[in-house]
């Protein structure tokens, strides 16, 4: 065989399959097919569904429905009830039903005291907490990265400070509580610097980056392409390079797509009205291979670890896939 790659099944620990509630955007079944076509055999679905995955029963619903799908699907439970940011869910019971981590993804936990409590509870069941790292007051009505390009386009900006301030807070809370903290979709140089510094003294901190933050910079938005309207936003070329360097030196542990499908109506509209998010499961490996292997010269084997063994370790999944008697992926 030529121009073929044999690798362990890829794992994406950050996807949005929209079921229950928005099956017009994606279902577990259609999301599974997208994942499988991209080489993924295992995914973790975020809880911002309708209703959210905030009860043991909702976690069990995902687990049972996932048995009909061609890949492994693991639910991530909501940290707070209805993702309201104030009332903690029954994390222990949800974990017993199969929740592999906890997050209010899409709705950052603004209350530092609540984030502390969530981290403390997570230590009891030894699972990571994943907080969408944006200060909502600093983010305000930002539609893209705040900078020269946003000024030229006349679009409200979302400063990198909105991310880095929240990342710094969460890192401090993780060190204080001794909990496992996973930082999703890192997008800025400042956030990378905070993570790098904390990881030198706290091995329980992990981080991910998306293919689109590695591939694009904010100049790509000059066409007002709503497919590139994501949260956190695609930032400057300096930020993009900092993310690549963070992958190279291990500051960033894995790649996750933040696969977030929408309807055509949600995207084929004006930039200010378009929904945040883009799909990524099917294009992930191609984009990552282009940026990290072809452009940056990383070894393919090391890049595959970012998509397989590293996310397995973050979530505590079985690593031994090839011994006799194990289920190969």
Each language-model region and where it sits:
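Divalent metal-coordination and catalytic microenvironments
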Residues: 3, 14, 35, 39, ...
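Divalent metal-binding segments
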Residues: 16-26, 44-56, 76-88, 104-114, ...
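Short, surface-exposed connector motifs at secondary-structure boundaries
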Residues: 39-44, 70-74, 98-101, 173-181, ...
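Acidic (Asp/Glu)-rich catalytic clusters
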Residues: 62-68, 91-96
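Histidine/acidic residue-rich metal-binding segments in metalloenzymes
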Residues: 88-255
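His/Asp/Glu-enriched, well-ordered alpha-helical/loop segment
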Residues: 152-180, 227, 248, 253-255, ...
């Amino acid at each position: 065989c030529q121009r073929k790659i044999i690798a362990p099944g890829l794992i994406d620990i950050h996807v949005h399959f929209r079921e229950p509630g928005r099956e017009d955007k994606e279902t577990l079944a259609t999301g599974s097919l997208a994942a499988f076509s991209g080489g993924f055999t295992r995914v973790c679905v975020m809880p911002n569904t309708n209703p959210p995955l905030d009860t043991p029963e909702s976690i069990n619903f995902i687990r049972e429905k996932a048995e009909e799908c061609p890949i492994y699907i693991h639910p991530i439970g909501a940290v707070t009830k209805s993702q309201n940011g104030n009332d903690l869910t029954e994390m222990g019971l949800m974990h017993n039903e199969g929740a592999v981590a906890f997050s209010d993804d899409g709705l950052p936990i603004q209350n530092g005291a609540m984030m502390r409590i969530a981290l403390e509870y997570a230590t009891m069941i030894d699972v990571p907490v994943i907080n969408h790292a944006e200060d909502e007051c600093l983010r305000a009505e930002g539609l893209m990265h705040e900078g020269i390009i946003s000024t030229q386009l006349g679009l409200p900006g979302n400063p990198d400070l909105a991310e880095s301030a929240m990342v710094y807070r969460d890192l401090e809370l993780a060190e204080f509580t001794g909990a496992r903290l996973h930082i999703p979709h890192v997008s800025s140089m400042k956030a990378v610097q905070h993570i790098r510094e904390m990881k030198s003294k706290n091995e329980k901190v992990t981080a991910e980056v998306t293919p689109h933050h590695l591939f694009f910079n904010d100049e790509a938005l000059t066409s007002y392409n709503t497919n590139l309207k994501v949260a956190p936003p695609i930032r400057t070329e300096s930020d993009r390079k900092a993310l690549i360097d963070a992958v190279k030196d291990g500051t960033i542990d894995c790649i996750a797509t933040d696969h977030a499908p929408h309807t055509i109506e949600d995207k084929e509209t004006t930039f200010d009205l378009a929904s945040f998010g883009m799909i990524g499961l099917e294009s992930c490996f191609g984009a990552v291979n282009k940026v990290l292997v072809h452009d940056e010269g990383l070894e393919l084997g090391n890049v595959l670890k970012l998509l397989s063994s590293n996310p397995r370790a973050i979530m505590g999944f079985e690593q031994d896939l090839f011994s006799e008697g194990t289920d190969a992926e």
